[in-house]
Amino acid sequence: MKTQLKGDRVLAEKEAVAEFYKTGYFGRPKGEGLELSLVEAAFLLSRGKLEIELEGTMLDFRYFFEQASLRQPNFELKYIVYKDLKERGYYVQPSAADFRVYPRGSHPGKSAARIFVHVQSERQLLPVKLLQDSVISAENVHKQFILAVVDEESDLTFYEVKTAVPKGEMTEPYPAIKTDATFLEDRVIAWDAQASETLYKRGFYGKMLDSERLQLSLVESLYLFSRGIITVRDRKGKVFSFDEFIEKASEIESFFLRKYSAYKNLRDSGHVVKTGFKFGTNFRVYRKVESIEKIPHSEYLVNAIPADFEFRLSVMSGAVRLANSVRKKMLFAVEKDEEIEYLDISRTKM
């Protein structure tokens, strides 16, 4: 069947509606003919189902592929993903999110699409705002959002991305006590033996320096400070104000306040939050801890990121793969105005 390449579309005559759309759901009817996207046309051309003409010249697959790449950004990436999904047996249609994918055993007209797919090269930076907006758009119409990443060898990795509202089960985020502590070089120590034991065993804060004294991280210290649990002094005995503590902590960690915002949000929502350093993340997070002697496996790994953050996909891939390999969810805590919004990213199979 002969077709015409026009701009970023391939136009076919009336008979194509019956041959391609009504049987395979390729393209969309327009007027009396059929309009195919470039990836759909390339797929059909590769299988010898149609011929494509440009200004009187018939295009072979190579020439058409080159022309399509000139006319549509990321064409080759989209074709790789489209071809993969079609060969898996899915009905796939182009959409604003790159593709919409129908459930197995279904097709357009029988049921609604189930998945929105966004295509990305491993080399491209991915703004978190773009990802958030895309996920929310999908979830608003009850769709699953899939990020399809094409690596330099044209292999595909699929990630499910969704919003999350983590909820913990700790009823007492901080014990009702008051005690003194000292800000040393890059951590804080609480000195009172009873208070240290209570914070450690009931609140699951810090790590005991010895049988009587408790070491606290900077985010733990500011959280307890903000709740009036500890009074923090410098090494000469001067009491810190809240702002002075933040200023000093920020000299030690440039992103301290962003990290603290995520920590506070997680603690306030009933979680136990500990360092995620061994996993290469900001935090490991527990929904419930009943005893310091029997700490369960953490449910989440969390990285705090700013609203203008751009993912390097190789780094994101490593974080997600590690989290999934140890049966944890990888959450990204996005600081947005005064709120924290979470993205849950996990590898998935199509």
Swiss-Prot record:
SUPFAM superfamilies: tRNA-intron endonuclease catalytic domain-like, tRNA-intron endonuclease N-terminal domain-like. One of its GO terms (molecular function) is tRNA-intron endonuclease activity. Endonuclease that removes tRNA introns. Cleaves pre-tRNA at the 5'- and 3'-splice sites to release the intron. The products are an intron and two tRNA half-molecules bearing 2',3' cyclic phosphate and 5'-OH termini. Recognizes a pseudosymmetric substrate in which 2 bulged loops of 3 bases are separated by a stem of 4 bp. Homodimer. The active site is at residues 286, 297, 328. It holds the Pfam family tRNA_int_endo_N. GO terms for biological process: tRNA splicing, via endonucleolytic cleavage and ligation. Belongs to the tRNA-intron endonuclease family. Archaeal long subfamily. Its EC number is 4.6.1.16. It catalyses: pretRNA = a 3'-half-tRNA molecule with a 5'-OH end + a 5'-half-tRNA molecule with a 2',3'-cyclic phosphate end + an intron with a 2',3'-cyclic phosphate and a 5'-hydroxyl terminus. The keyword tRNA processing applies. The gene is endA. It comes from Methanosarcina barkeri (strain Fusaro / DSM 804). Keywords: Lyase, tRNA processing. Gene3D superfamilies: 3.40.1350.10, 3.40.1350.150, tRNA intron endonuclease, N-terminal domain (3.40.1170.20). It comes from the Archaea. This is tRNA-splicing endonuclease. GO terms for cellular component: cytoplasm.
